[in-house]
């Protein structure tokens, strides 16, 4: 009976911590990125699949969340605003990269989409140099030139972590395939 109560208390503590972390993350989103979250183009990223069945929207939110967790875990002194905004916009390419029939289809999406995401983000937002660095270089080593700031290194690590979980289907998206979303 004692073991059961102890286990139950540990689970409750874990869920409380997770709830507090989510609450803090949403507070940071509201404070630093409400314009991005409210934008129609960013909301439309729900219609594009990133890895497996994960929508780009959720992938970017997860990368932003993991970036904050990594920076706190490692006690890295960085600019949270730029970290969150760069993480949210890191895959702002605004097309279905799986669609072989779209205009300008490029098989080397991994090499080209950071530049496309940066161009799209610059059209809609006033970006700092760090935010630009995050968006453009977080695909390193594919992008050849490594990130120049802590924030970009953190988003690079968070993106690779989230992408791995999504690709191995350890973190699932909406469960919908690209074809179901297109309907």
Q: Residue locations for each model-derived region?
A:
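Metal-dependent phosphohydrolase cores
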Residues: 1-183
């Amino acid at each position: 009976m004692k073991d059961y109560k102890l286990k139950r208390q540990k689970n409750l503590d874990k869920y409380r911590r997770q709830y507090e972390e989510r609450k803090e993350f949403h507070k940071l989103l509201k404070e630093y990125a409400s314009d991005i979250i409210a934008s129609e183009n960013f909301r439309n990223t729900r219609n594009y699949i990133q890895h497996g069945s994960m929508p780009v929207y959720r992938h970017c939110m997860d990368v932003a969340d993991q970036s904050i967790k990594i920076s706190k875990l490692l006690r890295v002194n960085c600019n949270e605003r730029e970290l969150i905004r760069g993480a949210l916009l890191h895959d702002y390419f605004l097309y279905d990269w799986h669609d072989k029939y779209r205009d300008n289809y490029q098989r080397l999406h991994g090499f080209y989409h950071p530049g496309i995401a940066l161009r799209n983000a610059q059209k809609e937002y006033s970006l700092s140099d760090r935010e630009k660095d995050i968006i453009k270089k977080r695909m390193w080593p594919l992008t050849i030139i490594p990130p120049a700031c802590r924030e970009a290194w953190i988003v690079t690590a968070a993106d690779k972590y989230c992408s791995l979980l999504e690709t191995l289907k350890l973190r699932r998206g909406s469960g919908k395939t690209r074809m179901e979303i297109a309907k």
